[in-house]
């Protein structure tokens, strides 16, 4: 077990990496509820700081620091909004870590093989909306490996597949519509 200062240093370094480097990874999101069988959703994530792009089979979402882009290939519709902080957190679970650190009890443990640090954040105040946030970080490079969010009877797990830091461009966080795409601009 690490001291609280060591845990906060690991989290701070991890969050600094997310702010200063471009993370890219394929992933699987598993959503499990007590009454239903778990559902798996594959996708790809690219993020740098608050900016991100998520591509999944039925939706594409991007945030460039100001505008949220949500594209549905099924309807060929692109919706533009100015998202709330909560909408951003729901779109990219890695952003939760930064928001939760100041308002949570933090517990750390090392994986059995010693290659990962597992950080559990439990809100001090249950009005936060989640019961538990578990982050697994690879020790060698502070790369996120998985995030688990427990909300009531629902558990969502994001498992990264071969995450890496890459060179990224700001244009990566914008979705440009095709000529015939319907654009629903809801920005204020």
Regions found by a protein language model. Give the residues of each.
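N-terminal leader/targeting segments and the immediate start of mature chains
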Residues: 1-39, 46-51, 126, 171, ...
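Extracytoplasmic
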Residues: 20-22, 40, 63, 101-103, ...
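Short beta-strand segments that buttress and anchor functional surface loops
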Residues: 27-29, 53-57, 118-125, 146-150
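Short, surface-exposed coil-to-beta transition loops
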Residues: 38-42, 55-57, 64-65, 128-133, ...
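An acidic-aromatic
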Residues: 44-91, 151-156
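Short beta-strand micro-motifs enriched in acidic
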Residues: 46-48, 109-111, 136-140
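Non-transmembrane domains of secretory- and envelope-associated proteins
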Residues: 113-115, 124-132, 139-188
